[in-house]
Amino acid sequence: MFYYPNVLQRHTGCFATIWLAATRGSRLVKREYLKVNVVKTCEEILNYVLVRVQPPMPGLPRPRFSLYLSAQLQIGVIRVYFQQCQYLVEDIQHILEHLHRAQLRIRIDMEEADLPSLLLPNCLAMMETLEDAPEPFFGTMSVDPTLPSPFDIPQIRHLLEAATPEKIREETLPEATPEPRKPDRTLAMVQSPEVITLQEAEPIRMLRIEGEQDLPEISRGDLDLLIAEEDDAILLEERQRGRLLRQRRASPPLDESKEEPRALEGDGLVSSLSPPAPAQVEGIREPLPDQAFPPEVQKMPGWEPGVLLTEVTPPQELRLPAPPSIEKRPPSPQRPPRRRRRGRQLLFWDKETQISREKFEEQLQTGAHCCEYPVVQPPKRKLMSPAELFRTPTLSGWLSPELLALWTHCAQVPPRMLRQRPQLETEETVEEERVADKEERRKTEALSEIEVLREAQEPSGPLMLSSELSLEVAEEEKSRTSFIPPEERWAWIEERQPEPPALPMLPELPEVPMEMPPGPELLSSEAVLRAVALELQANREPDFSSLVPPLSSRKLASRVFYLLLVLSAQKILLVDQQKPYGRLLIRLGPKFP
């Protein structure tokens, strides 16, 4: 292939777009197709083929193209031109669609030429135009349209000033109309057809591709041949059906009762699959005994062409057996009921298409092909012992190893001997507990007396001191729940049996009782009133947190809150809380002493 690289180089070569369109090397866009000048490109290809192009440099041979390259460029020009034509057709179609849509829009604005005919005339403007001429109907809303308009007065000055002709023709004045008179238009001069040289543009013709031919249209003769073949098939089918009918009539009636369901099934299938022509042929083939048709009437009613073609072979003539004559039939006193004609029977490959009733019941009785439903038994309710529940607090894997080890250590069941203590030991322990309770009560009474004396000496001191906080913390530590089960604690108490600590001798004003506050059950409303009075003397707003520190026990807080409710019910104090979980303010009531 002889060519120079600069000829087929993309974006620079003169044949680059045509070469790509011919070889389909890459996809071209619409802009590249429209940039090609088809006429100029064809001339350049012709110059290259005829070796008319000058060499790029003097002394070199003239550029030439091979036959293959020339053919490819010609194909590329055709494809580019075809694509340009297709773009043009699409643009025209797009423009026509826009014009059609614009015409379909409803015009809601009236044209200016139609406005004067639909609106009432402006009488004021007419008077100004006519130099304030009096208008008799000025101010009237409805005017008879047949009245003349001042603008329609004929102007005859130019007729009077013109030369008098020999014979004056009578001119009829035009009828007066409310619309302004339009000026006369000069008729356009119509030219002869010979002078007109404008010709219609030739339509774009598509190139005919060789080897592409349409299928020939079916002729009338081919249709007649197809109809004749179908008629032959129908006749053959009818003959087979007649043979089957004769065989069934010859067979005993028991066989008919067995084959009756099969025939009914065949009738339903034939009615949906077979064409309507066989039913008509059957009606002609088996006429009633009291009807007699001439032989020329016994034709197959159907589509009959108006004019038969000579070159078409006519179909075979239907030869049906002649109906039996009435004279040969023996007279019968009563005509038997007419049997229903059997439809076409379907032929199956298997002799037995379905299982018989006996075999079906036999298979059901054996139970080989069916099984009973298994009876679902409810799961037995498993009762777990307390020991198992203690050993497994949750499902496996849900509890961390540290908590599980702690649970298993504390969930050990003590031995039976430790759980069943003798009755004597229980009585002794009960007596010891009573004695310890009495001693504790005596201590608290002594402490309360000492506290009253100290309050009398130091009235400005707060209700709760740091020693009380430390003792409360000690009480909380004592009241913490132990992870050791009670059975083991009982065993350890019996083994150790610690001696109760000896109480020291208290002087008149000991310092130790200040570290042991009175119990919650010994608090009274008078103590709460004294604490509120102390807060007021210190110019502080009393609230619940000033009476009960945050580290106090729950029992003490509940006791103080109960006493506040009692005092507020007696209208000695007023308790106020502005928002939930907010400060509980304490104010003096009307009955405060």
Swiss-Prot record:
GO terms for cellular component: condensed chromosome; condensed chromosome, centromeric region; condensed nuclear chromosome; kinetochore; lateral element; male germ cell nucleus; meiotic cohesin complex; nucleus. Keywords: Centromere, Chromosome, Chromosome partition, Meiosis, Nucleus, Phosphoprotein. The gene is Rec8. Required during meiosis for separation of sister chromatids and homologous chromosomes. Proteolytic cleavage of REC8 on chromosome arms by separin during anaphase I allows for homologous chromosome separation in meiosis I and cleavage of REC8 on centromeres during anaphase II allows for sister chromatid separation in meiosis II. Residues 247-282, 317-344, 422-444 are annotated as: Disordered. One of its GO terms (molecular function) is chromatin binding. Pfam families: Rad21_Rec8, Rad21_Rec8_N. GO terms for biological process: double-strand break repair; double-strand break repair via homologous recombination; fertilization; homologous chromosome pairing at meiosis; male meiosis I; meiotic cell cycle; meiotic sister chromatid cohesion; oocyte maturation. The modification Phosphoserine is found at residues 149, 192. The modification Phosphothreonine is found at residue 164. Its main location: nucleus. Interacts (phosphorylated and unphosphorylated form) with SMC3. Interacts with SYCP3. Interacts (phosphorylated and unphosphorylated form) with SMC1B. Does not interact with SMC1A. Interacts with RAD51. Forms a complex with EWSR1, PRDM9, SYCP3 and SYCP1; complex formation is dependent of phosphorylated form of REC8 and requires PRDM9 bound to hotspot DNA; EWSR1 joins PRDM9 with the chromosomal axis through REC8. Belongs to the rad21 family. Residues 255-265, 432-444 have a biased composition (Basic and acidic residues). InterPro entries: Rad21/Rec8-like, Rad21/Rec8_C_eu, Rad21_Rec8_N, WH_DNA-bd_sf. Phosphorylated. This is Meiotic recombination protein REC8 homolog. It is found in: Nucleus; Chromosome; Chromosome, Centromere.
